[in-house]
Amino acid sequence: STLSSSSAASDVYKRQNLDSDDFSDLARLTRNTTLLHREWFTANERRTKLRWEWHEFFKEYDVVLAPVASVCAFPHDQNPKISERLLKVNGEKRPYNDLFFWAGLSCVSYLPSTVLPTGLGNDGLPIGIQVIGAEMQDLKTIRFEQLIDEQLNVFVPPEKYAV
């Protein structure tokens, strides 16, 4: 038995012993990494339908402009227990995993996304938007980002990262 197969067997055991009303981050992670094939297939079917909806959407629109995350850049919480990490959104403490919604918007459907810095917040950290395009249209999102950047011309690397 290899380490990975031992780990997988351990995760399956953990999943089988989860309480049905346990929706903690660890329980969700355990369930999502030990999907039965039929569960994965059902989820993939939903993803395929979503991909077709995006395909129809992009017949009429070139790109989608969306936030990169629910908050501007911030100093990262280094707590090793990710499930305990928190961030502030509009003054309210939220689970750290809320950050992944906007990235997931494009990733779940295999859509390209190019992030464009649009300036600096009051704390001096970058603010940006993402340009989402149709599947296989990476060059279109990159070109759109270049056109916006030519007009805004606002990106300045933070001092510690300037070369």
Task: Locate each region found by the language model.
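Short, surface-exposed loop/helix-turn segments at secondary-structure junctions
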Residues: 74-99
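A conditional alpha-helix N-cap/helix-loop micro-motif detector
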Residues: 2, 44-47, 95
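Structural helix-boundary/capping segments
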Residues: 41, 52, 95-97, 102, ...
